[in-house]
Amino acid sequence: MTANYTKARYFSFIIYPESIPTDWRVCLEKLGLAMAISPLHDRDEKRDSKTWDDNNDLIVNGKHYKKPHYHVLYIAKNPVTTESVRKKIKRALGVKAVSHIEIVDSVENTFKYLTHESKDAVAKNKHVYAKTDIVYLNDF
């Protein structure tokens, strides 16, 4: 296994409601780092029928939706590794809280993706969520 020591300040990750504590926002705020959290993404449609899973998908009116989740844009005070971010989030929210963390190349694009207003999300005709439902932590 090769360790990745690439450092960055801007990251994004996904959290699922069933894998986080009820006071998850307070737990994240206690980290003291600037974050923006998307509205709950509960209308992300799975358009490719090959990816449908009748046992785990949310199905409404015959349409299949991805499991509800939040996107988090995380800004570190100094450059850190993805693994250090993962450890910090797991300490705050529990070991099952986060599985995938990405380094963000464009804060603006990632921020727009929180509500599916990024160019890519618009091109894919994704459901648009309300900007007023974005949660800002620690002076984001």
Which sequence ranges carry the predicted segments?
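Histidine-centered divalent-metal-coordination microenvironment in nucleic-acid enzymes
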Residues: 12-14, 36-90, 102, 114
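Catalytic "initiation/cleavage/transfer" segments centered on a nucleophilic residue
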Residues: 1-11, 16-25, 85-140
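Flexible, charged surface loops at secondary-structure boundaries
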Residues: 4-7, 30, 65-66
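Short secondary-structure junctions
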Residues: 27-36
